[in-house]
Amino acid sequence: MDFGALPPEVNSGRMYCGPGSAPMVAAASAWNGLAAELSVAAVGYERVITTLQTEEWLGPASTLMVEAVAPYVAWMRATAIQAEQAASQARAAAAAYETAFAAIVPPPLIAANRARLTSLVTHNVFGQNTASIAATEAQYAEMWAQDAMAMYGYAGSSATATKVTPFAPPPNTTSPSAAATQLSAVAKAAGTSAGAAQSAIAELIAHLPNTLLGLTSPLSSALTAAATPGWLEWFINWYLPISQLFYNTVGLPYFAIGIGNSLITSWRALGWIGPEAAEAAAAAPAAVGAAVGGTGPVSAGLGNAATIGKLSLPPNWAGASPSLAPTVGSASAPLVSDIVEQPEAGAAGNLLGGMPLAGSGTGMGGAGPRYGFRVTVMSRPPFAG
C-alpha cells in the first residue's frame, strides 16, 4: 500500500480508530503460556519414560513405547521454542505499533489545520492572508509526510514481526493401520469365542445322554475315552486330586478327635481320670504317711471276696458289678420289679464296663422249662394299689 498517496486524515484516522496494541500484547502472553505448558509437558514425558524404562517396565514393549513417544516429545520441545519466538514477535509488533502511533499526527491537529485554512481563504478578500495560507498549506504538507513516513516504518516493522515460522503437526505415535487391525482382531476373537462356546454346548448336549447312561455302570466304564468327552475327562482328572486333598484335609481334625475320645475313654476306664482318680490323688499323702509311720499292723482276710457264681471278684469290682437277678421260680425270687438302681451318671466306668454279662446266664439255671412254653410272671405295678 502506498501510504504517501493517502492524506494524513486517512492515515491518522486508521491508526487512532483501531484497537491499538492490546490484542498483540494479549497474543504475546498467550504464546508465552503455551510455550511454558509445552516445556513442562515435555519434561514430564521424559521423566515418566525414564522411570518406566529403568525401574518398572523393561523389555521389547518398553523399547517400542520409547521409540513411539520420543518423536512426540521432540515435537513438543520444538513447538515450545516456536511458541516463545511467536511471543517475541507479537511483542515486537506491539512495539512497532506504539512507535508508529507516537509518530502519527493526531487527527485533531489535522482538523484544526484544515479549519484555519478554510478561515484564511474565506477572509482573504484583498490578498492580505496569502502568506498565512501558504504557511498553513506547508504545515499540512509536513503532516502528510510525517504520517506517510510513520506508516511506512510501521508497515516494515510489522511485516518483520509477523513472520512466524509455520508450526509442524505432531507426529503419529501409533500405526495408521493399528485401529483397523485391532478392530479385526477383536471381531475375530469374539467370533472365535462365540463359535467355541456354541461348539462346547453342542458337544455337551450330544454326549450328555451317553454320560448319564454310563453312570448306571461302574465308574471305570463311564470314564473310558470312547464314551467320555475330552473336556469332561480333563475336568475329572483335575478335580479328583483336589477332592482327595480336600477330603484328607477336612477329615484330619475328625481323626484327631476320634483318637482323643478313644484315649479319654480308655483312661477313664482305667481310672486314670474322673472322680476315682481325684479321690486317689487326695488320699495319696495319707496313704504314704500311714505306710511310713507304721501305726497299725497289716491285716488280710481269706474267703471274703465277692463272688459271681464260683468266681471271686477283685475288690474294686464289687461296687461296679450288678446284682444277680434270681431265677424265675426259685424260692428267693419275690414277685417284685426286677429294676435295679443304675450307677450315677458322673461315675467313671472301668475297662470291663461293670460286667454287663453278669446276669446273662439266668435263663440256664433250670428254674423254668428249657423247651416249649415259658411261664412269665409279671409283678404288680405300683399304681395298681
Curated annotation (Swiss-Prot):
It holds the Pfam family PPE-SVP. The gene is PPE22. Gene3D superfamilies: PPE superfamily. One of its GO terms (biological process) is response to host immune response. It comes from the Bacteria. This is Uncharacterized PPE family protein PPE22. It comes from Mycobacterium tuberculosis (strain CDC 1551 / Oshkosh). Transmembrane segments: none annotated. Belongs to the mycobacterial PPE family.
